């Protein structure tokens, strides 16, 4: 699709808004947990939201649209993960220092100017995702940039804000939200207008920005923890905002399909939601500038030079240097190095390869390929496995107590029985490594069958020894025995 369209001739303009949850102990304005582990609500409250005029006397068009939909909002409350602050029954507490530190580090990594005083603002949102009818947000960085293909990509601003409640269902004007996501610290990174780039290049730019944020090792991972909003226009046409692209790999397709929609339809300024297949659906009119006003319950926060200097001293290794180090020191391919850089297992990967005598490519492939495949194809709940179990797994590999082919089966076992160890998996699955002599003994009767081909003999032998010896070694043994 991309080859058939000249995006430069269309004057494609794109603006990115990347939202990344921070992995802090507490929420942004209270001491509730951010882990979202609770499944059963302890109560449900019901609200109706109404728009109010800004200090200039105007009502935001998007807020008015949501109000006219006349919906009722039902909020699920969870123990230790929701409190009076989320219910809008209590003023916000002091801004979370851990979240501010991390957000400022991200802004510094993006070469932003940091204001010497920051102010929490209220942004009107009455779609029900905020019980208060507004989202608290604070600008903590401006005028930053990253480099891409020799060009400077403008980062207009970085904001620290509270995440919205997660929608559970909507039917007949009744909307149900979970309150445990509301208030989790979230960093929003906004780019300047990207013009002269293809959808694939814009996706690469989004990836680079995401890597910068995740290099702090203080960001959450998994579905819903990072979301992209994208603003798109062509040929001086109206701007369309598309919200909620949850998979980075879908971003280029969303842009391509939106360009085609704008070419084939008469469009107007509006906000649309991204679907899982890359198409979009109408949400509401595009919001205006009348929905921002000061948060009166939180005083301005002074950002001193000493504070910023201390943060600069503890900035993580730049991702570009880490990428080159992974490729040169660990001999990872460019693709594998980039994948592990963006993985939630990055820190664990570095810990293992720095302390174990195992091949880094095997460790990286386990975390970015094997685990993904098991989660996608077999719905294995890998998140049930602790870091210590993974470390134990590679201890066994280092000591040659298992072969790399056994890793997928062991991971499946550990996910099913997280209380058990790798040793238990070996016994239960009968994955004790075989010697070449033992394989020859198993293969003897098979290769001696009349008219059997190498491919068939190899397949039969592998079915009997899979996970107990390297596949290349089996191939070598069978070839030798069939000469």
Residue ranges and their predicted role:
Residues 39-40, 210, 354, 365-375, ...:
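Conserved mixed alpha/beta catalytic, RNA-binding, or beta-rich assembly cores of soluble enzyme
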Residues 224-236, 327-351, 361-377, 414-417:
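Core structural elements
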Residues 323-327, 350-354, 372, 391-398, ...:
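Amphipathic alpha-helical segments within well-ordered protein domains
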Residues 336, 348, 358-367, 389, ...:
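Residue-level detector of well-ordered alpha-helical segments, enriched
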Residues 363, 374-384, 392, 396-397:
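M16/insulysin-pitrilysin zinc metalloprotease superfamily fold
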Residues 382-391, 404-466:
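Strongly charged, low-complexity linkers/loops
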Residues 456-483:
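Short, amphipathic C-terminal "tail helix"
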């Amino acid at each position: 699709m991309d080859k058939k369209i000249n995006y430069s001739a269309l004057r494609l303009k794109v603006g990115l808004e990347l939202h990344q949850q921070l992995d802090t102990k507490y929420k942004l304005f209270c001491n509730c947990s951010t882990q979202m582990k609770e499944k059963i609500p302890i109560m449900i409250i019901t609200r109706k939201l109404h728009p109010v005029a800004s200090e200039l006397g105007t009502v935001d068009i998007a807020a008015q649209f949501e109000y006219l939909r006349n919906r009722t909002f039902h909020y699920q409350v969870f123990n230790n993960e929701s409190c009076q602050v989320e219910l809008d029954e209590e003023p916000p507490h002091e801004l979370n220092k851990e979240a501010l530190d991390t957000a400022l580090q991200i802004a510094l990594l993006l070469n932003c100017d940091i204001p010497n005083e920051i102010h929490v603002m209220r942004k009107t949102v009455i779609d029900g995702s905020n019980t208060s009818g507004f989202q608290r947000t604070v600008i903590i960085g401006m005028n930053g940039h990253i480099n891409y293909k020799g060009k400077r990509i403008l980062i207009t601003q970085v904001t620290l804000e509270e995440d919205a409640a997660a929608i559970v269902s909507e039917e007949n004007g009744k909307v149900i939200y979970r309150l445990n996501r509301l208030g989790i610290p979230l960093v929003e990174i906004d780019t300047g207008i990207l013009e002269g780039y293809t959808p694939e290049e814009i996706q690469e730019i989004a990836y680079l920005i995401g890597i910068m944020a995740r290099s702090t090792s203080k960001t959450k991972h998994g579905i819903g923890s990072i979301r992209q909003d994208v603003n798109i226009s062509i040929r001086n046409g109206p701007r369309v905002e598309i919200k909620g692209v949850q998979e980075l790999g879908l971003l280029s397709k969303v842009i391509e399909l939106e360009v085609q929609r704008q070419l084939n339809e008469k469009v107007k300024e509006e906000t649309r939601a991204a679907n899982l297949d890359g198409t979009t659906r109408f949400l509401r009119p595009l919001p205006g500038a009348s929905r921002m006003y000061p948060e009166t319950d939180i005083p301005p926060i002074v950002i001193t030079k000493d504070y910023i200097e201390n943060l600069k001293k503890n900035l993580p290794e730049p991702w570009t240097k880490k990428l080159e180090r992974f490729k040169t020191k660990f001999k990872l391919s460019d693709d594998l190095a980039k994948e592990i850089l963006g993985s939630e297992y990055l820190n664990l990967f570095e810990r293992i390869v720095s302390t174990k005598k195992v091949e880094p490519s095997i460790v990286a492939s386990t975390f970015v390929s094997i685990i993904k495949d098991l989660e996608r194809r077999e719905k294995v709940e890998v998140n049930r496995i602790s870091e210590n179990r993974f470390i134990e797994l590679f201890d066994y590999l280092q000591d040659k107590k298992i072969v790399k082919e056994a890793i997928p089966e062991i991971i499946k076992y550990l996910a099913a029985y997280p209380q058990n160890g790798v040793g238990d998996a070996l016994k239960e699955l009968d994955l004790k490594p075989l010697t070449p002599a033992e394989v020859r003994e198993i293969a003897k009767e098979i290769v001696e069958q009349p008219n059997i081909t190498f491919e068939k003999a190899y397949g039969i032998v592998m079915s009997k020894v899979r996970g107990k010896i390297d596949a290349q070694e089996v191939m070598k043994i069978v070839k030798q025995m069939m000469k």
